[in-house]
A protein has these predicted regions:
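Short polar catalytic/cofactor-binding loops
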Residues: 10-16, 45-47
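Generic detection of short hydrophobic beta-strand segments and adjacent strand-loop junctions
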Residues: 1, 26-28, 103
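Short glycine/threonine/proline-enriched tight-turn/helix- or strand-capping micro-motif at secondary-structure
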Residues: 18-29
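NAD(P)H dinucleotide-binding glycine-rich loop of Rossmann-like/cofactor-binding domains
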Residues: 73-78, 88-145
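Glycine-rich beta-strand-centered segment in the early N-terminal region that forms part
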Residues: 30-47, 55-99
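Short structural boundary motif marking the start of a folded domain
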Residues: 3-8
Length: 145
């Protein structure tokens, strides 16, 4: 049984401010997970400043997004099916995945979100995620604040 997924593709590199015409929603189908794989349903996706720099052909510290393919970014998802004992169905994970409603990933590309009742899970895409780490390094290692 395959899982129907929706993906957001970059159609062409924007000239100036990105518009809806630069993107398209496409259908895809994911197979059931094999040993060591986990099927997740993405709940939150992060839209970060570095992504605009990847919407160009210019060389940078990270490769540009591929055209006619899902954009990539950090996400939080709920495990739907798991073929790995470390990831229970229903648990929350973070990953770097395509902009898609669902993703099939190997266990090494997933990180469990700890159960912290007072902290909303989406904070792991902001202050407790890559943007927060970037800010911390910038303040503590570069600016010496």
């Amino acid at each position: 049984m395959s899982i129907a997924a929706k993906e957001i593709h970059l159609l062409h590199y924007p000239d100036g401010v990105p518009t809806t015409e630069d993107f398209a929603v496409r259908d895809s189908a994911l197979p059931n997970p094999l040993d060591g794989e986990v099927l997740i349903e993405n709940i939150w996706m992060s839209v970060d400043p570095y992504m605009r720099g990847r919407m160009t052909k210019r060389k940078s510290y990270i490769p540009p997004f591929e055209l006619n393919a899902p954009l990539e970014g950090h996400a939080i998802g709920r495990v739907m099916q798991s073929r790995d004992p470390r990831f229970a169905e229903g648990s929350l994970v973070t990953s770097m995945t395509g902009w898609s409603s669902h993703a099939l990933l190997e266990r090494d590309y997933l990180h469990p979100i700890p159960d912290m009742p007072d902290i909303p899970p989406e904070k792991f895409l902001g202050v407790l995620g890559m943007p927060g780490m970037t800010a911390g390094v910038g303040l503590n290692r570069i600016a010496y604040c």
